[in-house]
């Protein structure tokens, strides 16, 4: 037998033997493959109970603050992707609202996960600034101009950003999008842009798309160089591949999860390159402050005088 054939045959036998061994293990130890995994140990429960007693969980002010300005929520809990699958599913987290104290979840994580159940349209500054929350990992903000909306940070997916725009238009009245702002280069703050504007309107100047200088370079390069590693880290850090329940995926701390929809990008037509720059768009005065190399390689704060 040629040596190559021998190696292939030996590898096949080894693989078959491994499969038989794993199959036997699975048959003998079905609990090992329980989707719950191991229940919390006595040590873990004692540690958790100690934290529960030590931290100020009786302070409910954050829950009161999170409810302020609530206007409306949509009649649905799922947002479908253009490809036909579910892009966003708040229904899968409703168990968090049962009021139950889950021994398998760190108490601070459970508290944050409940706070992140905010879902719908909120008024931040009366008559001027609004947010749609709970449609993606980040929040999308809408500033009311003289004639239209200035959209801040259009989420991760075109479908969730589009749904947010539809919600605010259906609730407060139809207005065109006259501007978009990318606050920084992380994907959850720009990849839904094609859900709120058309590229032709940006190219023609009909819509002003504002971003910090160097945005395109860092938005693309960071995901090329570090995207795979960041995705794998997220899967481990937030258990995003597990079922959504007290023994699996619970939350992603700054939001529920990342929307699984259409990732898009439109190049900005107005860059902020100075430390401080001022722009007035549709009657709204905005002062931009460069804060690059803080939370992102390129980033800016925006002040509304």
What spans do the regions from the language model cover?
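Conserved beta-strand hairpin/beta-sheet module of binuclear metal-dependent hydrolase folds
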Residues: 114-175, 299-304
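N-terminal signal peptide c-region/cleavage motif recognized by signal peptidases
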Residues: 19-22, 26
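Active-site metal-binding motif and surrounding structural segment of the metallo-beta-lactamase
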Residues: 147-148, 158-209
């Amino acid at each position: 037998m040629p040596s190559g054939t021998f190696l292939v045959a030996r590898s096949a036998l080894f693989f078959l033997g491994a499969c038989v061994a794993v199959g036997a293990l699975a048959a003998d130890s079905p609990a090992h493959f329980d989707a719950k995994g191991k229940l919390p140990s006595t040590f873990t429960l004692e540690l958790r109970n100690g934290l529960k007693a030590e931290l100020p969980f009786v302070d409910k002010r954050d829950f009161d603050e999170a409810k302020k300005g609530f206007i409306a929520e949509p009649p649905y809990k799922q947002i479908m992707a253009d490809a036909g699958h579910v892009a966003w599913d708040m229904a899968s987290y409703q168990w968090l609202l049962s009021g139950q104290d889950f021994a398998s979840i760190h108490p601070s994580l459970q508290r944050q996960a409940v706070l992140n159940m905010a879902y719908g349209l909120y008024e931040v500054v009366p008559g001027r600034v609004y947010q749609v929350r709970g449609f993606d990992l980040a929040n999308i903000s809408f500033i009311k101009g003289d004639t239209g909306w200035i959209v801040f940070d259009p989420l991760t997916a075109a479908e969730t950003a589009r749904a947010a725009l539809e919600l605010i238009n259906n609730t407060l009245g139809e207005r065109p999008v006259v501007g978009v702002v990318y606050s920084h280069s992380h994907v959850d703050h720009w990849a839904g842009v094609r859900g709120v504007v058309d590229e032709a309107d940006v190219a023609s100047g009909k819509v002003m798309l504002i971003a910090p200088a160097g945005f395109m370079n860092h938005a693309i390069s960071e995901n090329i160089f570090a995207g795979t590693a960041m995705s794998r880290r997220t899967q481990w850090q937030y258990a995003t591949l597990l079922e959504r329940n007290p023994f699996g995926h619970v939350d992603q701390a700054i939001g529920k999860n990342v929307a699984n929809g259409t990732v898009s990008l439109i190049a900005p037509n107005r860059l902020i390159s100075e430390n401080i720059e001022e722009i007035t768009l549709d009657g709204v005065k905005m002062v931009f402050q460069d804060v690059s190399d803080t939370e992102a390689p390129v980033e800016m704060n925006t002040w509304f005088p």
